[in-house]
Amino acid sequence: MARPVRGGLGAPRRSPCLLLLWLLLLRLEPVTAAAGPRAPCAAACTCAGDSLDCGGRGLAALPGDLPSWTRSLNLSYNKLSEIDPAGFEDLPNLQEVYLNNNELTAVPSLGAASSHVVSLFLQHNKIRSVEGSQLKAYLSLEVLDLSLNNITEVRNTCFPHGPPIKELNLAGNRIGTLELGAFDGLSRSLLTLRLSKNRITQLPVRAFKLPRLTQLDLNRNRIRLIEGLTFQGLNSLEVLKLQRNNISKLTDGAFWGLSKMHVLHLEYNSLVEVNSGSLYGLTALHQLHLSNNSIARIHRKGWSFCQKLHELVLSFNNLTRLDEESLAELSSLSVLRLSHNSISHIAEGAFKGLRSLRVLDLDHNEISGTIEDTSGAFSGLDSLSKLTLFGNKIKSVAKRAFSGLEGLEHLNLGGNAIRSVQFDAFVKMKNLKELHISSDSFLCDCQLKWLPPWLIGRMLQAFVTATCAHPESLKGQSIFSVPPESFVCDDFLKPQIITQPETTMAMVGKDIRFTCSAASSSSSPMTFAWKKDNEVLTNADMENFVHVHAQDGEVMEYTTILHLRQVTFGHEGRYQCVITNHFGSTYSHKARLTVNVLPSFTKTPHDITIRTTTMARLECAATGHPNPQIAWQKDGGTDFPAARERRMHVMPDDDVFFITDVKIDDAGVYSCTAQNSAGSISANATLTVLETPSLVVPLEDRVVSVGETVALQCKATGNPPPRITWFKGDRPLSLTERHHLTPDNQLLVVQNVVAEDAGRYTCEMSNTLGTERAHSQLSVLPAAGCRKDGTTVGIFTIAVVSSIVLTSLVWVCIIYQTRKKSEEYSVTNTDETVVPPDVPSYLSSQGTLSDRQETVVRTEGGPQANGHIESNGVCPRDASHFPEPDTHSVACRQPKLCAGSAYHKEPWKAMEKAEGTPGPHKMEHGGRVVCSDCNTEVDCYSRGQAFHPQPVSRDSAQPSAPNGPEPGGSDQEHSPHHQCSRTAAGSCPECQGSLYPSNHDRMLTAVKKKPMASLDGKGDSSWTLARLYHPDSTELQPASSLTSGSPERAEAQYLLVSNGHLPKACDASPESTPLTGQLPGKQRVPLLLAPKS
């Protein structure tokens, strides 16, 4: 082909392709001329391309004619014990050298070819050690295989820095020692390290500092323990093989640092458990192989650090049960292999959380009850597509055995001696594609009639091999060949439960028994078994009985009794009997046994005594089974004052009951009750709260008159109850026949007070916590009496009487002018008061009384009739309107006042001219004198006087007026027996002139300031008597009149007696003492003066 090109040098170029080919040949022609023809293959070898195969020739030395073009040289399976480096001088292209299965005792030198050799295979020689100097010349070495030699140790000088080795195989040697840092020289390049089949017994912590290593093979060594942090430094490791060692324990953090590892092989070891601590840090693990170990139990939280695990292999272990949620944290798991274990119990919810699981292998276990009786064992496996139960002990399939597996596609029940399948056991599996059943023990009765047509309808009969074993007429026939009418139930060969065990509760130490009975028409041997929490009791104490159930003797009844002697807490659980014969097993209901212990106190509350404001602490703790609940009561109830005030603290898990800031109300009996289902016990403790003495009601100063009775009350509280002692001054009180004390000394009564009783009284309250004192100053005034002869009194009381009388007269005039009607009413000297219909009576329920409570007077006498003085000089009262005062109350200390009979007419004349209102001289001739007994709180009137009060409600805007003014005599007329008597302070002969020389003028001025109601009734209807004289009225302000006088006048200006009469002047004196007592509930009312008929 080159010749035409060369021959066409002078010819024109016909195509670009030919030109490129010609240029290429011109470039190669000098090389061909220089190299000459290709060297022939060595005489004792074979050639294939650039590979020279001299293996298996029995060579003891290198061939001498190795061609220079050799890239791969195979010298394996010879008898080479040493290598001459000169034989490799002319091999510039050599990259692979196979020297395995020779008799070399050291790593050979390949002379000039060593620098470009990439792969060196030295396995199956007799090399005893590796020296760093032997490997320094291999500057391009990436693969070094030293497996199956006699290397016994690896020191830190074996592999120097320099050779970029990526794969190092030291498997099959006799290495027993790995020196720390032995592979540090390869840290920049090493990707795969094989140390399998050696004699390594221990791995040093941080033995491997190989950050680029991805695979580490340590299988078939003698490692027994993996310490924590052993593999730290292997940051890129993805596959770790530790199978076939003798590992029995993985300490916490054994695989710490392997955060990128995907596959972990731990098969064929001696592990008995896998806990979360040993798998700590394996966050990226996808496959975990733990088959052929001795794992007997799976811990619930053992997989908390492997949440990305896709495949878990636990085959060939010693698992006997799968507990609830024991695999719940493996939410990403897709394949779970549990074959060849001894699993007999799968708890309900054992696979809960495995929502991604697709393949579940349970072959060759001892599963029976899970499929025959339990429902819900496979709940949570929503994505499961393949379930294999081959080679178990399943004899029947319950209706709900596979509930929760609606998406299942492949179900393998082969290798089980299945005898019956309950109706619709597989109906809910809509996606089922394969159902493997292989059994020749089917009981072909009416309960199996549904199965053949269902399998045919779902086209699953090809995977089912099912043969009848009963009745005899159908024995050996396939269920698909039996006519539907032949599936009949003439008897019940399989046992039927007729007596179920019952749930019970027992005290510790008692004997308990469960009874279970079943009936069957079969004569085949019957076996009995009891299960506790779905696990068979191997050494159960049972009694078994059998007797004829039917009269014809065809049905037998079998009874089994389980005895539990001296039960303990370990006997608690759910018990179930299983009665089995050749045709199947029957499972009873599960009866629960609860073992209880009556509560007993470990801490009991004790009586405590504390002060107020401190903290009370009560302890109470009890034991029992179930754990007793602790409850507290106070005085037999649940009303805790401290709880309402949030001062009570009870911790649920604590034994202490606290009350902070203790108060006296917290005292009482506290009961601690411990209760569980076995019973209850209680213990009591008394909380005594100590309180320092204190007064309930403050002790006040008192003022009494000579001859009266005074009571001083010292009502004290405290705990213990305080002892009360009375002192006068600084000395203990000397008791006389006038002094009386209650039994507890809280009330001191002094009768017939004398001047010497005045002074400072001290009440001393003391108990064990301290002493408190309270003081009261008792003042005694001279005795004061009331005489009927009408003595002149102080001008202040006269001013009050005159103000009220004049105010009443003005109001009568206003009523008269505005209403323009006459209404007569008669007044007699009787106990009755006649009131016009428009004026509400203070004795009736109409209207309201003016709330005047300036002063009151008290009496020790009982109630009397309305407004009349008795023969003894006492004025009666209306008892229905005013309550009877305390007979021991202190008498009023107001001097008795005498009101004269004369009125000053001049101010009223001026008022008549201005407003057209009649003055008092037109309404009454001759004033009447009224006496108020200041000591007896009664009103005293002169005999024969016609003086009647008329209360007016504040709310009454238009009270009616009398029909007309009564004719009267001169305004200077006086009754002869009502003249004022002379007193020690002075006399009041005939009481000349007005007693109110200036008050009338002031009242008149006040009236003029506020326009009165118009006579035609069109004026302001709110102008009432209450507004006229009430001190708080905003329309009429008497500040310039009544209050501008002396203080005695200001206090006495509204003085009224409780029955509505003006007080009579008694024992006038130059200075008047204002009244200081006040009786609650007393009301002062305005008065109307009626003329004498």
Swiss-Prot record:
GO cellular component: extracellular matrix; extracellular space; plasma membrane
LRRNT domain span: 35-68
Region (Disordered): 946-983, 1063-1093
LRR repeats: 69-90, 93-114, 116-137, 140-161, 164-185, 189-210, 212-233, 236-257, 260-281, 284-305, 308-329, 332-353, 356-378, 383-404, 407-428
Protein name from the UniProt record: Leucine-rich repeats and immunoglobulin-like domains protein 1
Residues in compartment: Cytoplasmic: 816-1093
One GO-annotated biological process of the protein: sensory perception of sound
Pfam families (alphabetical): I-set, Ig_3, LRR_4, LRR_8, LRRCT
Entry-linked CDD domains: Ig, IgI_LRIG1-like
Name of the gene encoding the protein in the UniProt record: LRIG1
Organism: Homo sapiens (Human)
TM ranges: 795-815
